[in-house]
Amino acid sequence: FEITNFSNNLCYSGKVLSTKSQGAFGELWSSIKTVNVNGKRERENQINLVEAEAIVDTVVKCCQNPLYRNMSMGVISLLGDEQGEVIKDLLEKKLGQDKIRERNILCGTPYTFQGEERDVIFLSMVISNNIKFATLTKDSDVRRFNIACSRAKKQMWLFHSVELEDMSKDCIRYKLLDYCKNFKIINKKGNIKIA
């Protein structure tokens, strides 16, 4: 429920639309994880290499962890195609094609994942403070983030290089990071203010 609650509130006025299984792995398991990597977005493209490397290292560790046995995985860039391509290339070098096929690992943008789900999804926010970034408030932004945040069946990781105070509260990125960092508190209160 924790994973889908953000999307449900964002797009469906809080009505629960999915009953994806969560918390099936005991106390060590959290259905939502955030990782601040303090990376920097490159000036000439939409790549945050530190974030990409952190995601790849985490995917590799998850593939080696018995808790993730037989789980499919996906990586979604929340800013353009380039980050997903870099992550895909790094995964091919670190894991190899056989392990990528075995885990059904897919890398791309939210639209790459339309109609697709994976047990574990890793989101890359990409943006950082070294380059100005837009406040995302359009319906198309909301749809993109809704797709990204509703692809995980068991666990979602959000990798970021900015903090809440770096963004406008109106930005969908702010709302996602706030939810992921505070989902246990928000769910106990029973609601999250999206708009």
What kind of feature is each model-predicted range?
Residues 76, 122-124, 149, 157:
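Structural motif
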Residues 91, 97-123, 128-131:
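Conserved motor-coupling elements within RecA-like helicase/translocase cores
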Residues 1-22, 78, 162-165:
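Conserved coupling/interface region of RecA-like P-loop/ASCE motor cores
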Residues 8, 21, 94, 130-195:
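Helicase C-terminal subdomain and adjacent C-terminal extension
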Residues 14-89:
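Conserved helicase/translocase motor-coupling segment
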Residues 29-32, 117-120, 152-156:
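Short glycine-/polar-rich loops that comprise or flank the Walker A/P-loop
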Residues 1, 80-83, 112-114, 127-130, ...:
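Conserved nucleotide-binding/hydrolysis micro-motifs of P-loop NTPases
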Residues 3, 55, 75, 115, ...:
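Hydrophobic, well-ordered secondary-structure elements that form the walls
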